[in-house]
Amino acid sequence: MVIEKIDDKSSNSPLTAPRLIDLIESQFSESQVSADTLIQHILESLNKHSSQYKYIVSVTSIDIPTESSSSCEIDNKFGASWNAKKDGFLTHVLEDKHAGKNHVVSVAWLSK
């Protein structure tokens, strides 16, 4: 098994990085709604661009604490365009009581 670290993670993208950013920003400007709807619109746009790829879109929403509240709420949404019979996704939360942290571990698999 060969493991390769690449600094530019968009080098093999079906869209250039600036074009992909424009697509995401335009869908956000048009939808300005829930994370689920944003995911759906981004996936639809990507699928129209190229059907040769499988796409995974994850949206993590973080409520910024206010002066009256020091707590932070985090919400994550996930959407994908794939073959549901062959591909899948699993998220599992690990509670680290000693460190006082939770670790969210996500695994996605896509058939070739």
From Swiss-Prot:
Keyword Oxidoreductase: no
InterPro entries listed in its UniProt record: Tctex-1-like, Tctex-1-like_sf
Gene Ontology terms for molecular function: actin filament binding
GO cellular component terms given for this protein: Aim21-Tda2 complex; cell projection
Listed GO biological process terms: negative regulation of actin filament polymerization; negative regulation of barbed-end actin filament capping
Keywords: Cell projection, Cytoplasm
Localization, UniProt: Cytoplasm; Cell projection
Sections of the chain in a coiled coil: none
Family under the similarity heading: Belongs to the TDA2 family.
Protein name in UniProt: Topoisomerase I damage affected protein 2
Gene that encodes it: TDA2
